[in-house]
């Protein structure tokens, strides 16, 4: 806001709040500027006044032009006599039931900035079906942290090599588009929709391009072909429902172990739980316990989030613990590609449960028969008839006919997924002189004449370094799939390592345009973008491997030293600082509160409620549903999200936050242990990320744990630290 009119001298306080102007007078609607100083506007000057047309100026004058008793005048439009303008020929074909969409280059625009060409293989097209009049609908209408509306997957369409696409969609239907990678996971989310008129050609330059962008003067592959028809999903177009889409995946792959007979999450179907929002509400919902047990392992934006354009892959499936566990190898389970694609779609659609509207006629004042009436009117006036209830029923029948619904047979093999167990025991690895205690670690480090150094970025911004001596150790372990088998690793030369993760202040000293942004809240009615992750002393995040290396290159040019990311071998050696345990301070069962910022009891405050959301009360009946992030409840590290670096105790070599706060990029390619494979550099796509973060539990934050991301990804909980080898 630049200035409020009237009240030109009243200071502007930037407040974001639902019902901000409730009880505030005068109230205004639909201002129409006459020139720089005068405006026609609909105004209600007081609670008991009429809505009328007023002339408002920059001199604080409010002059009534017209009002009418019993009426509200709300649309001031000045008219002037003029010649009839040229008639623009119609761009629609009223009898058509389709529209055409043309995307010139999906890699153009802020939404896919930095995504390498060739990454996007297809587009997922889905349609929204909105709620009914006075029927129960809210941000939890479709699930926990899911959304308001039904999402119907219409199909997919390939993207051409040059990034172009030309395809048909149903006319008069609100559709949304998601660009997919080779695995079928969305790289970006379109958080709005478009609607094509019958016969219309809808076009855009790219993905969330600037509104002032003009088409690029080039011929595209798609424009030289016929518009493609959508490839409809197997089983037909239908709303995405947990019970019919995801539960069969759990039945085939998970319930042989996750069956309620142990401490693991129970993924069996038909274990129903009642969800009731608020003491006075009459709306009771039923959720499968399997849904409530699975969705906490999915990272997603929820019904509302920061309105800033999302970084590409912000909510990519690889950011979800569920997918990382499965990709790393979970107790020998190899989930078929078809089932993985189903999980990706579930995540990309915000992890819904219902995919339907329930209890439509619950409220006494709700019009009856709305479902049929909507179809009748939609068909009459737009030629579209969406019977989402029938689509769900038809798909359920299709599942039964194809023996995919009950987990009795597998999706493609005719059997439940086989769990592959190790065929032979793995021998323990021993390294002479390892492990060693804190006293020995300190002594090894002290053998260097000087153990601390400082790199200067600007006169006011520095990076502190500490010396890490050479040595040998047991790298990895034989318990974690991604970190096995354990093997002897050698760090032949000592090196200098930054004592902390690179901070926002340090990174912005060289890349001032970078913004680590915010961590989103759950619930809705947000009054801020979220919890700040961009304060000066917090570790930089949403920074790609490529950008981390660019930072190292600039520091090298400034200092004259060779600055780089550590290899994962250097990183683990430094993190262990002599320890063979999960952490330098103990095991995954240890109290980490004084040592690392991990997922602890403070994360309960991520469960919020209300207008201007605040943490839920401990006795709130909804808290058990919304306090879902996996955590260690008996530890308190006193930090909700990432915190200023060096807030906890350092390890014996003076390194802070190695296992927590945020995870860290390394220089290494993600190849199997024991790292002897001569990797084809072009074939290795991902880079290794080490350590854990504020939203991860100890077992996923150990010194041995490995994660992997594409070098252009900018995860919200990954940063980096640097090493220098030749100071």
Short names for language-model regions:
Residues 70, 80-83, 92, 115-120, ...:
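Aromatic- and Gly/Pro-enriched helix-to-coil junctions and flexible linker segments
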Residues 2-21, 71-73:
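Surface-exposed loop and turn segments in beta-propeller and other repeat-based domains
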Residues 474, 479, 525-537, 542-705, ...:
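Functional-site microenvironments in short loops/helix caps that host divalent-cation chemistry
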Residues 1, 48-54:
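Structural motif
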Residues 454-521, 543-546, 660, 726:
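A short glycine-rich, aromatic-capped structural motif
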Residues 27, 49, 72:
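Beta-rich catalytic cores
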Residues 39-42:
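Residue position within the beta-strands of beta-propeller blades
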Residues 19-33:
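Signature of short aromatic-glycine-proline-rich micro-motifs recurring in repeat-based ectodomains
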